[in-house]
Amino acid sequence: MFWASIGRACAIRRRARTTRSARPAEGPGQERRRFGYRRLHVLLRREGHAVNRKRVQRIYRDEQLTVRRRAPQASDGHAATVTCRWRPTSAGR
């Protein structure tokens, strides 16, 4: 059996050291990070898994899977222009 340091083993295989520690995504919770436990529960039910919503919620919380929030869109600082001008109608008379 040959023992080598992690850096040397990665150099021999011509791989970056960071690829060794990276894990592939596993399961629907990792693949669909914008889904919360409710939507994930529906997906599991559609696939035929008889699973309770509370169990999915507990596992989701224990694995610290949170919904990735979308970044807020930066505005240019100007108010949007009105596409339809307001004018009084004759119905108000």
From Swiss-Prot:
This is Insertion element ISR1 uncharacterized 11 kDa protein A1. Pfam families: HTH_21. InterPro entries: HTH-like_dom (IPR025948). Coiled coil: none annotated. Keywords: Transposable element. The keyword Isomerase does not apply. The keyword Ribosomal protein does not apply. It comes from the Bacteria. Residues 14-33, 68-93 are annotated as: Disordered.
